[in-house]
Amino acid sequence: MGGFFGVVSKDDCLFDLFFGTDYHSHLGTRRGGLAVYGENGFDRSIHNIENSPFRTKFDKDVQEMKGNMGIGCISDYEPQPLIVRSHHGTYAITTVSKINNIDEIVQDIFDKGHAHFLEMSGGDINATELVAALINQKENLIDGIRYALETIDGSLTLMLLTPKGIYAARDKYGRTPIVIGQKENAYCVTFEDFAYRNLGYHDYKELGPGEIDVITTEGVKTLVAPGKDMKICTFLWVYYGYPSSSYEGVSVEEMRYRCGACLAKRDNVKPDIVAGVPDSGIAHAVGYSNESGIPFSRPFIKYTPTWPRSFMPTIQSQRNLIAKMKLIAVHELIKDKKHKVEEKV
């Protein structure tokens, strides 16, 4: 999946950018990146975070980077943000995307003229670089972003950092979210709305499907109005999203309670306890327990200090290992009992 966070401030933005980006660590464990713009132009840092958390890897960078605007990301695959120099000028870009027609887009760009892409290990093309190439096909950034949203088969939500501000664009069907927060002297742009709560921001707006906004120190301006065709990914509520998040005004935690309650109404089993598999299964189990009246218990404990979410690695054997090692059973709560176990709905 992946997630991102951006800041436009009248003051230095690094504190908010660092912690806001870190609050997206549940969405990816592959790479993290920060890009900022200030008096000295653009600066960027990208690190592998597979074996060390985002905060540890970027603590030194944050002390050295300076700027009043910036974007950061947690990526589950390609390195980003990228800094791109084109006829639009220089900009930094980060994306949350799933592009199904990469080969067709690449060939179309090749057919239109001289172009090249840098291959990542394994021969894959960086999807964020491909999005930048699509944007650069048009005469201005707004038309370029619209063209990218329309051309991609799959999903694309992005942030683009320029010397003037941050352009934010939501997937044309709203599959993935993008939210703007506000506080005195600053705006933020984020995938997860809870990411700005502890930083002092309050809700400003949630972009609609295909909406493009530009955020500057002076305010937020809508450049392309939202469409009406909403097809948001429901797995955000069921699994990907953090419990304290909300999408389209619907709380993740409350949605999981309701899903568990619906299961309880459907079932006719009578277990001794209801249990959830951490992390997302816990709230489903709580909802089931509340509705059924059957006690909730925690016979499966996740070892949170070191084990990440098991869906992140691309190698199945690694996913199997993490899934096995991260959960520790409490045998005293399991032995001789009938269980109703919720993994996720």
Language-model regions, residue ranges each:
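Short alpha-helix boundary/capping motifs
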Residues: A133-Q137, E291-S292, Q316-S317
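Generic intrinsically disordered, low-complexity segments enriched for polar/acidic and small residues
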Residues: M1, L236-W237, A285, G293, ...
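Short, glycine/charge-rich flexible loops or terminal/linker lids adjacent to PRPP-binding catalytic cores
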Residues: G293-E343
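Alpha-helical hinge/cap motifs
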Residues: S97, K344-V345
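Conserved short alpha-helical segments that host acidic/polar catalytic motifs at enzyme active sites
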Residues: M1-P209, V214-P271, V277
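Structured, non-catalytic alpha/beta "coupling" segments that mediate domain-domain communication
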Residues: P209-E211, A283-S297
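Glycine-rich phosphate-binding loops at beta-strand->alpha-helix junctions
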Residues: A275-H284
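The Walker A (P-loop) glycine that initiates the GxxxxGKT/S ATP-binding motif of P-loop NTPases
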Residues: G276, E343-K344
